[in-house]
Structures are given as C-alpha cells and as structure tokens.
Amino acid sequence: MTAIIRQFLRLEASGGILLIVAAIIALIMANTPLSALYNEFLSIPIMIKFGALELDKPLILWVNDALMAIFFLVVGLEVKRELKEGSLAQRDRAIFPAIAAVGGMLAPALIYLFFNHGDAIGQQGWAIPAATDIAFALGVMALLGRRVPVELKVFLLALAIIDDLGVIVIIALFYSKSVALVPLLLAALITIMLFILNWRKVSNTAVYLVLGFILWVCILKSGIHATIAGVIVGFLIPLRDKEGASPSEELEHVLHPWVAYLILPLFAFSNAGVSLNGVTLDGMLSTLPVGIALGLFLGKPIGIFLFSWVSVKLGIAKLPDAINLKQIFAVSVLCGIGFTMSIFIAGLAFEGAIEAYNTYSKLGILVGSTMAAVVGYLLLNSVLPKLKQKQK
C-alpha cells in the first residue's frame, strides 16, 4: 500500500472519530438549555464583498455551500488519482468495487422508495440512503487495528470513492434548482479555461484555486449546487506536470488534514444537532425515517453483497486476494454509515420543505448509521483473524 493511501486511511480513521464526537456534542447542545447558543452560532452572519459582488449568508450555509466545496475538491483530487494511478487504474481491480458500489446505491434507494412512493415530497429524498461516509466507516474499522487486512481497507476506500462519484452525479442531475443562464455560461467559460490550463500542464495550483473560487461563485449564482465547482477543479488540476511532479497530490496533501479535522467535523456539528422537541413515536415510525434507516442498514449490505457475490459467481469480477465474502459482507454493513453525506443530501432534497422532513430525515440517518456502525463492527470483529499472541 502506497504512502499516500496509508496517510489517507490514518487521517480518515481519526477524522471519523472526531466526526462522532462533533455529532454527539451537537445533539446534546440542541436538546439542552444550550440550544439557543447552538442556534445563534449557526446563524452568525458572514458577508464577503468584492466590488459589486456581495455574498451574505449565515454560518451554516457557508459551511454547507463553501466549506463542503473544499471537501468535494479533495474528493475530485482523490477520484482522479485513483482512476489514473491508484486502485481503480486497472480494469480487473476496479470492476469489483465498482459493481459493489452500484448495488450499494441502487438497493437503498429502492427500499426508501418502497416506503415513500406515496409522498410526493418524501420521494425527493430517494438518494439519502445511497451515500457512504468514508471517514466514519474507516473510523469504526480503525478500532480493530492491525487485524484488518490491507486489501479490505483498499476495497472500502475504492468502493467509497466510486460511491462519492455517484453522489456527485446525483447532486448535479437531481438536486439543482432552476438554472440562471448568464452565471451558467460564465461557469462554462471558466471551466474551459481550467481545461486549457490542464492541457498545457500549468502546475501553479494558485491559478486553479483563484479560477475555482470564481467558478464557485458563478455556479452558486446559477442555481446548480456550488459544491460541484470543487469537483470540477479537483478533476482539472494536473496529476503530473512536465517534470513528473504531482501538483494534484501536493494540494491534496495540504488540504486533506483541514478537511478531515475541521471541515467535516464542523459540518457534522452544524447539521447533526436535531432537536427532539416535538418528535413523537408515530413520527419516528413514519415512512420517512424508517425508509432512510432501513435503506442504510439493510439496503447497503444487501446491494453491495448481492452485486459482489453475483459478479464473482458469473466470473465478471474477481474477489481481491487475502479477503473472503464474509469480510465483504461485514464491510458492506459498515457502508450503511451514511451520516455526513446522507445529511448533506437530505438538506438538498428537503430544502424549502416543512421542518418535519429535515428533522425526521436526520433522525432516520442517525438511527440507520448507528445501527450500521455497531453491527458492522461486531461482524468485522467476528470474521477477522485474531492477532497471534507473542510467546513469552
């Protein structure tokens, strides 16, 4: 396993533990006398002004629209690296996690729609249980230490990267508002400029980031979700320059600790603080939270394992060396931890809907993700080889 992947796994695992802590603190604050302080913090107004351009948003929207664009920039950098030089570069190595990821997105969406097909607003949340929180999943896996085979970690990483790619496509196609033409045309022009810079192998990442900020503003104003700007920039920063150095990896190395230790925990803190005031048992047993929780807890493992098993039996894909189907199933349960990514999609799906949709969707995500984390850990613990005791 390369040094880059090792560093990625260490950061994601420890960052996942920080995510859990941030979410617990948010839940406590939202349901105690500290709730007023919590809501005031999220509502802090922040304004950025450049000449005639003025962006005035509360803190929570800066987190969701701006900081998460940086997260998706890192995702873009990671996906490009893995597609060109990493675990997805060779077809025979990429096809197994790719097929698993497709099943892991399809089955949860179908389970969710089974429960919510009669609710026109609820149907919009079909993609909520399709996402996997790689940081959280690796954080749980890290609790088992050296017992986890490297190949199993790489499988989870590759699956999650393809899953992220699917989420990006879903956001672009299904969760964008009505489009404003002029900002969209400007965004297209800047994207062409970035493409030309990439083609000429311009290695100065500052140029890409400045144009990326302008692209983010244009996409924000166009009505398409602004996080897509991060993905575009991530894909268009060169993986190798003319001398063979990697501007992409250098930027990823700089940004990744900020994403793992600040941006994602701050996102979790800002969005996981669900007030249980007014929450009823009937509401918790309604189709929205049940569809999300079962989509994550049952849909993810059913889809990932079924598609994996069928692909191996039909000879379409090959099971990676040093791991078995029992371990694949245990990891597929861990992939039901949707958490930050599911919360992010829920915010897009139910933007403008009554607050109950946001509240119960987040509760469904928290319940489903918690069940997936606990059961996934127990299953992994039972199927992984025990460490040999040193003889005295």
Curated annotation (Swiss-Prot):
The entry's keywords: Antiport, Cell inner membrane, Cell membrane, Ion transport, Membrane, Sodium, Sodium transport, Transmembrane, Transmembrane helix, Transport
What is the disulfide pattern of this chain?
none
- One BP annotation, GO: regulation of pH
Hydrolase in keyword set: no
Classification via InterPro entries: Na/H_antiporter_dom_sf (IPR023171), NhaA (IPR004670)
- Reaction(s) catalysed by this chain's protein: Na(+)(in) + 2 H(+)(out) = Na(+)(out) + 2 H(+)(in)
Membrane-crossing residues?
A: 17-37, 59-79, 95-115, 125-145, 154-174, 179-199, 213-233, 254-274, 290-310, 328-348, 363-383
Q: How does it sit in the membrane?
A: Multi-pass membrane protein
Compartments annotated for it: namely:
Cell inner membrane
User: What do the Gene Ontology cellular component annotations say?
Assistant: plasma membrane
Superkingdom of the organism of origin: Bacteria
Q: Which GO terms describe its molecular function?
A: sodium:proton antiporter activity
Family, according to the entry, reads as follows:
Belongs to the NhaA Na(+)/H(+) (TC 2.A.33) antiporter family.
Q: What does this protein do?
A: Na(+)/H(+) antiporter that extrudes sodium in exchange for external protons.
Annotated protein name in UniProt: Na(+)/H(+) antiporter NhaA
Organism whose genome encodes this protein: Proteus mirabilis (strain HI4320)
